[in-house]
Amino acid sequence: MNTKELIASELASIIDSLDQEAILKLLETPKNSEMGDIAFPAFSLAKVERKAPQMIAAELAEKMNSQAFEKVVATGPYVNFFLDKSAISAQVLQAVTTEKEHYADQNIGKQENVVIDMSSPNIAKPFSIGHLRSTVIGDSLSHIFQKIGYQTVKVNHLGDWGKQFGMLIVAYKKWGDEEAVKAHPIDELLKLYVRINAEAENDPSLDEEAREWFRKLENGDEEALALWQWFRDESLVEFNRLYNELKVEFDSYNGEAFYNDKMDAVVDILSEKGLLLESEGAQVVNLEKYGIEHPALIKKSDGATLYITRDLAAALYRKNEYQFAKSIYVVGQEQSAHFKQLKAVLQEMGYDWSDDITHVPFGLVTKEGKKLSTRKGNVILLEPTVAEAVSRAKVQIEAKNPELENKDQVAHAVGVGAIKFYDLKTDRTNGYDFDLEAMVSFEGETGPYVQYAYARIQSILRKADFKPETAGNYSLNDTESWEIIKLIQDFPRIINRAADNFEPSIIAKFAISLAQSFNKYYAHTRILDESPERDSRLALSYATAVVLKEALRLLGVEAPEKM
């Protein structure tokens, strides 16, 4: 039980009109530490109690007598709690030094499955910074849900089907060079894709030709299938190399093509339940009762099935295969209307588990304020970007620590971590402008700043030869160590908030705050000097390092021991 929960529990025992959960939501952290560590505003009780909030606050303060508080005083309409710093710091440091990286582990999920649809790049197109968001947000959510007791299934729903393959086949047959594609598959396929789109703007017959080749592909034409398979295989080799760079793994690569033979069954169920309506030759599901104006288009007039039909098939397959407690789609916010339709159609089909489906949208990455587009060739490719980030990180590491042994390995962890952290510290639904220089900086709210704080602590612990299991009883009561203790104590709640809101930025911002608080402490405290507090200060340093490393791990970022 953390401090806020303890206060809420104590208050709930003497307040009849509010339960513990409601009290917890009302608790505040005073801006001025002289007003205590936590405050409870009595305004909400005034109407029920028919008393002035000041009087209620005074009565509550008088009734509080827990050992955990140094003192409890009423200041106007607030009950201000001053916590016993020594007792709480001892409790927190004991917990972290005992549990180590398992500190803040929880079993909320009871080992139930969470399916995470993430990354999902399009075959035969380069892996760009635009795909990075879904990849790193999904990967971080996987770590976060595992931390609170769920099992996760990471699905890479590859874009390996659709009209774009018709376009690519036409482009390859017109202008392609087999040897050039074999040598540099993605580069060559991208050039072909950009060229056919540009030419199709002036020559509509290319669009029709592409549709025809896609129809051949759908009908199992040997040449079309062979080219499609080749494009897919070459792309996957490239993608897997990048996923290895990012240290991201998947449990399934079932993409769009996997559901080709599963969509007719969806159409049959919709038909049997009388949900399909005719509209201009197409078959649709009306969703007006869900407040959705546009019907879900299930089958076009030419008999072709659509994106939503495929996603319905995927949802049914995943529920059957994984019996998920939650199914999360980490997909850009421009797809919000699609996922509202998906959930509504599943609800219409009688599947109550549609409530367990969540679209986790995210904002766009721009470059100098401009939207990125593969079709127009205006794209930031991930592979050269990672190489550049690693190179910049290495320059800074060599300047800071020229004697470091494994510079290349550390530079890779810092460069890749910098890109991931910058993405994840941004509130998910906001976009951000891509700025590699800002990402790789060791100053400011960046991944390298947090990693460097961790490495600095490891250096202190090595100098002291500190082993937590041999440390004695420790406690601290100074103001600067207290700021760190409060953050560490809050870590389990931070993880829960990140999971509840599908928001890794909550963890990233926490890591920044903890690193900043420790750096401030380090600047003002002689940690290694012989003193009665030395062991306790080292224990605090150790606990900070454990929590920083774990916070970074939850973001999919490595924490080098030396930098």
Swiss-Prot record:
Chief location of this protein within or outside the cell: cytoplasm
GO cellular component: cytoplasm
Annotated EC: 6.1.1.19
Matches recorded under InterPro entries: Arg-tRNA-ligase, Arg-tRNA-synth_N, Arg-tRNA-synth_N_sf, ArgRS_core, DALR_anticod-bd, Rossmann-like_a/b/a_fold, tRNAsynth_Ia_anticodon-bd
Example GO BP: arginyl-tRNA aminoacylation
UniProt enzyme class: ligase
Alphabetical keyword list: Aminoacyl-tRNA synthetase, ATP-binding, Cytoplasm, Ligase, Nucleotide-binding, Protein biosynthesis
Catalytic activity line of the entry: tRNA(Arg) + L-arginine + ATP = L-arginyl-tRNA(Arg) + AMP + diphosphate
Location relative to the cell: Cytoplasm
Gene Ontology terms for molecular function: arginine-tRNA ligase activity; ATP binding
Motif residue range(s): 'HIGH' region: 121-131
Subunit annotation: Monomer.
Family: Belongs to the class-I aminoacyl-tRNA synthetase family.
Name this protein carries in UniProt: Arginine--tRNA ligase
Source species: Streptococcus pneumoniae (strain 70585)
